Amino acid sequence: MSSIVVVGANWGDEGKGRIVDFLAEQASASIRFQGGNNAGHTVVNDLGTFKLHQLPSGVFNPDCLAVLGPGMVISPALLSQEIAEVEEAGVKVNMCISDRATLCLPLHALEDMLEEQRLGDKAYGSTRQGIAPAYGDRVMKKGILVGWLKQPEVLVERLQFMMDWKLPQLRALYPTFEFEQTAEEMANWLLEVSAPWRDSICNVTLPLKELQAKDKTLLFEAQLGAGRDLVYGEYPWTTSSNVVSMYAGIGSGLPALRPERVIAVAKAFSSSVGTGTLITAMEEQDAFRELAGEFGATTGRPRDMGYFDAVATKNGVELQAATEIALTKVDCLTGLNDLKICVGYEGDHSENPIWPQTAALAPIYEKMESWSEDITGCRKFEELPVTAQKYVLRIEELMGVPVKMVSVGPGREQMIMR
């Protein structure tokens, strides 16, 4: 048996979905353990191109159980829509959804939007999907559990309990807030939109333990990256959950998990979407962004583009307790003459910066040789141009962790194993 956790070393959008899709061919379960509809994983396979938000990326393997763990906040209508989209492509979804996961309601999305509007130029850059309010309700013990969809009377009671607490606050804080739906109406809507998957709700610990007992491979998939972790990311520009590998067990239903492999995924350059500091930001970003297709999978927002930040990435690799690295989008660097790696920071607090200290730091660069050859057809590391090999090996040296996977394109066959 092996437990493999796939996590982000940076700020998200590193290409975790395609790594999970690649590994899921040999896995018996693919598990999402945190987050919700706020970030997308792009998967390219024989069936097409998919932008998954709540389904695990291993859903395309018919022999792989897709698990939505208790650490998630689940948007019910959007989950039904996502299931319908992959089924339309010919995928038979084999799924379990934790009864302990939390529902992310349209009311949460409305609250999220109103708060971003209230904050104005101090907004967090939220995707406005309701993630922070849903997690906040869970912490305040007002959250709505997925398992209550199977207990309609309890569902109505808990919705009323939540609304009695929440609605007066929203009306007081946001003058434009309007919400007329009753608890009974909301419950009826929830039962309607969850119908396609409600039979999949269960205690997910049980099937996962059964697979462990049979010595099967379990694949755990994180959303976003270490730089967005609620505790260790660039607070307050973080997500609302823990995205580090140590949370995989807690958020999946296997709290005693001790993973054998932790794969930290990093792009061959730096990029970030949302508010925060990208210390290695390029002066001219537009052309490279278009070439690399760097736009948010959920919002379509253009990502900020930068040179590879070895300082931030090494911090992410260490936070994730990574045993290996998957380096993605190396092919996008072909023809980039101004190729360099940030190997340090200049400025106060450069050893362990927290915001806003990060905004005052300047990168220290190491110039690297570039290459002009098309590498998308390379299938062995030795087939890469020598300068591309040196680039990967320099990153490996700086990280202190082996780069075991090198991606030279979006297809499964374009993953070089070392």
Task: Label each region the model flagged.
Residues 1-418:
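Non-transmembrane, aqueous-exposed alpha-helical and coiled segments at domain scale
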